């Protein structure tokens, strides 16, 4: 009989690989808050992506109403909280990073958004009241037990839960590398794993793929820079035994254009949503 994949355990394994790598960086001087020097840069990246309309934002706005409340889990610098705030009674923004929340406070003051309340802490260990809608946009990747994370969302949601996740092509550069290193195509937590976790929890969620297609392709100035980036993403910094394979992979898959190396466009966003069972 074929063995059934424990998708939550796979998610946990991938999170733990990244957590171990993060602990090493903290010991080498990164600090407990990895966003301390990157929060404003993160915000600029979000703003650049949001210059283009996408179906996820339009769809979520079509589902909420002026008398409802929204919970923004892993709010970061507040792009979603600020988007939702004019359309609901109030928003609660939850995030563990003081660096992110500091930028969020600046943004709330600049927009005079008085109906956004901030709770600092890691989900699902924070104390908040149930809301009509809950949203987590790409902020679940660091939590090892996604099933518990989802149960926390449902517990605090009266109507609809929304999750936005990275959906990677299972033949992308990172997937080919992961097959070689780990025997499966997953380099990190993503939509495919999360959706299978939902199914194993008995949740048959709806999915809306972003209609803008793949994210903007990444660019590396050299093959060596591309190798360093790929190794960083695979948590292989300081480990050289796979370099020959990875360099060959990058030579095959990246294209050289105008003096730089362009990665294939292989990632988009998936909006997953379902009615809370609470």
Predicted ranges, named:
Residues 1-64, 160-187:
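Conserved class I S-adenosyl-L-methionine
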Residues 71, 77-124:
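Class I SAM-dependent methyltransferase SAM/SAH-binding core
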Residues 125-129:
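Short conserved loop adjoining the S-adenosyl-L-methionine
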Residues 132-145:
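A short SAM/SAH-binding and catalytic strip from SAM-dependent methyltransferases
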Residues 147-162:
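A short glycine-rich, Lys/Arg-flanked "PGG" loop and its adjoining helix->strand segment in the class I
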Residues 187-202, 206:
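Short alpha-helix
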């Amino acid at each position: 009989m074929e063995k059934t994949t424990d998708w939550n355990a796979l998610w946990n394994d991938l999170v733990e690989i990244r957590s171990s790598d993060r602990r090493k960086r903290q010991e080498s001087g990164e600090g407990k808050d990895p966003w301390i020097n990157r929060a404003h840069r993160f915000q600029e990246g979000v703003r650049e992506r949001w210059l283009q309309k996408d179906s996820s934002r339009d769809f979520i706005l079509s589902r909420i109403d002026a008398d409802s409340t929204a919970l923004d889990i892993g709010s970061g610098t507040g792009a979603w909280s600020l988007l939702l705030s004019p359309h609901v009674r109030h928003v609660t923004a939850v995030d563990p990073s003081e660096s992110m929340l500091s930028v969020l406070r600046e943004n709330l003051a600049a927009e005079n958004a008085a109906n956004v309340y901030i709770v600092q802490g890691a989900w699902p260990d924070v104390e908040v009241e149930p809301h009509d809608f809950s949203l987590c946009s790409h902020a679940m990747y660091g939590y090892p037990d996604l099933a518990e994370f989802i149960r926390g969302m449902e517990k605090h949601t009266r109507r609809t839960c929304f999750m936005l996740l990275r959906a990677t092509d299972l033949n992308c550069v990172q997937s080919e590398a992961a097959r070689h290193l780990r025997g499966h195509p997953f380099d990190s937590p993503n939509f495919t794993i999360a959706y299978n976790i939902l199914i194993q929890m008995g949740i048959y969620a709806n999915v809306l793929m972003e209609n803008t297609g793949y994210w903007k392709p990444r660019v590396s100035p050299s093959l060596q820079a591309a190798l360093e980036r790929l190794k960083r993403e695979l948590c292989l910094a300081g480990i050289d035994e796979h370099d020959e394979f990875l360099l060959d992979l990058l030579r095959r898959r990246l294209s050289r254009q105008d003096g730089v190396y362009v990665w294939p466009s292989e990632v988009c966003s998936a909006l997953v949503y379902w009615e809370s069972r609470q």
